[in-house]
């Protein structure tokens, strides 16, 4: 039994297995009752590890648990029964961030490696999806190569945001535009696939369609 003491750090050594477990308790932020617990395993014995959570008092609430990014793990580590939702990385869950899923534009399917929403407190994330599968881009040396992943989708989304800001700045009487307004403009023009309910945890409000967003904006 490991007691909850905010701000405390506990180390536990399993004598025979020589495995050390470090448990650290934190508050996510001030004026918020959400708690953050770090559990670190050192020299973990191979096998199945089970973590039991027991409330200190009769109350209600949800528990979420995540593994570090795959690049930060050693060996094969995974949950036996995992949930693919609420799996995007920070700062994607921020209130003022623009969160982009990535999908295969040829097959119209979200990539299995794309993080999913919603947030812990049910904010709608991702905002929309952008192409991120086999995206051709410039690399050092004057060459072009294909890239796959959220970084490719983010680059496309950032370019789209820049074009929207440029277009607005050139309109008569333009007063500038905020990042939240740019996000809303993109969301307004998102493309929806038939038979899918939007918003959802994979696509957000749909796929980015910059031409449609600007066309709608032009008609307002």
Listing of model-derived features with the role each one plays in the protein:
Residues 18, 103-155, 191:
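Catalytic-core environment of secreted peptidases
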Residues 16-56, 63-69:
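Beta-sandwich interaction modules
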Residues 38-42, 78-92, 111-114, 209:
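N-terminal domain-start motif of subtilase-like serine proteases
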């Amino acid at each position: 039994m490991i007691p909850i003491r905010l701000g405390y750090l506990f180390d536990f050594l399993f004598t025979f297995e020589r495995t050390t477990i470090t448990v650290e308790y934190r508050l996510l932020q001030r004026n918020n009752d959400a708690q953050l617990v770090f559990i670190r395993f050192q020299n973990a014995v191979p096998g199945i590890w089970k973590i039991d959570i027991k409330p200190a008092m009769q109350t209600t609430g949800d528990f979420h648990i995540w593994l570090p990014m795959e690049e930060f793990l050693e060996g094969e580590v995974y949950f036996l029964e995992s949930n693919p939702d609420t799996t995007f990385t920070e700062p994607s869950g921020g209130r003022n961030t623009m969160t982009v899923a990535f999908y295969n534009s040829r097959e119209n399917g979200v990539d299995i490696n794309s993080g999913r929403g919603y947030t812990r407190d049910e904010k709608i994330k991702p905002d929309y999806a952008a192409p991120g599968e086999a995206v051709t881009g410039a690399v050092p040396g004057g060459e072009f190569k294909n890239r796959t992943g959220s970084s490719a989708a983010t680059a496309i989304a950032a370019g789209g945001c820049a074009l929207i800001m440029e277009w607005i700045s050139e309109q008569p009487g333009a007063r500038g535009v905020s990042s939240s307004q740019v996000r809303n403009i993109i969301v307004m023009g998102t493309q929806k696939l038939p038979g899918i309910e939007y918003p959802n945890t994979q696509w957000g409000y749909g796929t980015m369609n910059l031409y449609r967003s600007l066309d709608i904006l032009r008609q307002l």
